[in-house]
Structure formats: C-alpha cells, structure tokens
Amino acid sequence: MKKFFETIKNIFKIEELRKRLGYTFVLILVYRFGCQVVLPGIDANLLASFQQNTQEGLVGLLNMFSGGAFGNASIFALGVMPYISASIIVQLLAVFVPYFRKLQMEGESGRKKMNQLTRYLTILVLCIQGPAYMAALHNQIPGQAFVAVNQLGWSNFWFNMVSTLIMMGGSMFVMWLGERITDRGIGNGISLIIMIGIVARFPHAIVAEAGEKFTTTNGGFLMFIVELVIWFFVVVAAIALVQAVRRVPVQYAKRVVGNRQYGGVRQYIPLKINAAGVMPIIFAQALMLFPLLFARWDSTRGLAATLGNYTGFWYNFIFFIFVVIFTYFYTAVTVNPTMMAEELKRNGGFIPGVKPGKKTVEYLDSVMSKVTLPGSIFLGLIAILPAFAMILGVNNSFATFFGGTSLLILVGVILDTLQQIESYLLMRHYDGLMKTGRLTGRSGM
C-alpha cells in the first residue's frame, strides 16, 4: 500500500503528466456542466416521463453514451454517438471499399483524410438524429413543457430547427473536447467522455440499490455486501477478458550492419481474445429492435411481449447469439491476417515452423478463429449478466454495472488511461502502477 501511494505521488512529480491530467480534468468538468444545461425553451421540471423512457434498450444505450444528457434534453443530448456511428461506417468502408483501404495504408496523410471524412459523416448523422430526437421529445413529454412554443409564440418548426442546430453544435463541441483531451490530455478523449458519463451514474445506482436492500423485506445489509462481492468478481472477469491475449511467437532474421547485429530475437504477436471490444454488444442491441418491430404485426401482441421482455429467456438467448455472431464479424473487420503477414515479411520476421506468405496468413487466421470462439462466448455471457442480476432482484440502475456495455467500457477505458500513465512513469524511471510494469490496454472501442 505504501508503494502504491508513493507511485501516486510520483505521478504529480512529472510536470508534463501533471499538466495533462489537469487539462483533462478541466475539460471533463466542462462536459459534465453542459450535460445539465437543458435546451432553451423547454421546462426541465416536466421531463420526468421522457427520462423514464430513456433507461432501457437502444435508447438507454444512447442515454448512457451521452452521460444522461439524452434524457435531460440537454444541449449535449446527442453526445458522441453520431461521431461513433460515423467512425464505424468509415471503418467498414476501409474494409470493403478499395479506395478507403488504400487511404488507411497511406500513413499520416491517409489518417487525416479518414478523420476529415469521419467529421463530414458525423454532420450527416447529426442531421438525421437531431430531428428524430425532437420528434421523440414531442411524443414523450407534455405540450406545456415547450415554453418557447406556448408562451413565446414560436412555431413548432422554428423551435425544432433552432433546437436541432443547438444540439448539432453541442455534439460537435463534445467531439472537439474529445480531440483536445486526446491531443493535450491523457487517454482517448472520446472514450473518456463516454466513461465519465457512465461513472456519473454509478453513485446514484449504488444509493438506489442500498435504499432497496436496507429494508426488512429485501435482504438488508448482508445481501447488499454479497452483491458488491459478486460485482467485484464480475469486474475481475471483465478485466481478464479485456487483457487476455494469445501470444504468437515471431522470429526475426539476423542482419549485420557495420559492426552491429540486428534481429535474431524472438518476439510475439499478441492476438487479443476479445479484439472486437464492446462493438458486438452495441450492434446486437441495435439489431434487437428489429425482432420487436416485426413482432408488432402480431395481432395478439404475445410475440412483442416475449421479445420485449429484457429479462426473458428468448430476448437474452437471441441477444447472446447476436453478440457471438457480431464478435466474429467485427474481429474479421478489424484484424487483418494478410496485412499482418505482409508486415512480418517486410520486416524480416517469420513464425517458427510456418512458411512466410499464404501459409502465415492461414495460420494467423486459424489462431484468430480459435481464440475468438471462447472470447465471443465470454463476451455474450457478460452481455446478458445484467438481465440475470435484475431477475435476482438487483435494482435496474445497479444491474447495468454487472456486465454489458457499461462494465466493458469502464474497464477498457480505465486500463487504457492507466497504460498511458504507466508509460510516463517508466520513461522517467519511476515504478509503474503494476508490479510488472506491463499494463495492457484495449485495441479500441
């Protein structure tokens, strides 16, 4: 414990790291303040019904990604989700369209063009999501909440137009905050913004769960402690999933330049068990809307009730299958064995016992397929853990932290940020945050 506090003290001894942490903290405060600022012309006291309907399903995911701003009808209501959607589209284009694949391989200049395209696509997504959000707002909250329309005489069209432009500006500002944190702060800015939004909900979730359990009928203090212990082990399991890798040995050929010898050492390619991150869960949650949509055509509404039951067997079974399928799909999109084999060949590396070229591609593809199977099953189980927690009597707010997107984002972003801090400490010859000095982050969200 003494060594841990010594390490924390060392963090603040490094001037650059201290400045980066301070800069990150200030920008996060700006973001959290903006999440509480309600759109002009709306009575915040009449938003209760809308907030109640933004707790579950895909809408709940949007609310989580925006740090509650979505349910607050805030100027930051659209948050970073449009940017994430645009990033996913650009990633898919880089896989399936040769022009974008070529851009991706052009180094820094190609990355700048891809980033510019992502920004343009973000604006396009905002133009769709903004009006859709305002339409949902009109359907969910009472008419008297729209003060600008009722008391100031604004037409619905102009009010919606101005509100949409404000939210678009807010979302672009959040995106800018994320980029500033990445460039001048610590960690990945966009990921940190999402994580802070999730963390902001945690105290409320703990208090709500404690309030329910500290009664004579719900298990009391002992049950609350048992839940916290179980949650701790779930967090450990999530860390294991994020950190786990299959190391493929790589040998580099010896080269002699002048009087110095290079290469000849054995290294490893770390193939992550969960290379897809949280994206399969996000895709699966989005896709779960379609069975519900088709079920509405059922005249008895029995199918809709079955598929719309978040704690029911069929919903979670289909959700689990979707997560497994999308884990394989997204891993195939993000991990390119052909490119890895070419990079090895270019640098004079080879896998012992495997011929360079096509055989290396086949070997890497085979290994990736084998490690993805347990990874996808484990990810699927973590995705449906919140439903099991709800069935066992855990409060809905706290249950979301027992697995799923919330937990994986929290674990992944914290590990990424600690990894950056670790690198600063090791560069200045201080002890790292972990005994080994080798903290492994995620490959991406």
Predicted regions and their residues:
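N-terminal cationic and glycine-rich segments that engage phosphates or anionic surfaces
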Residues: M1-Q104, S109-M445
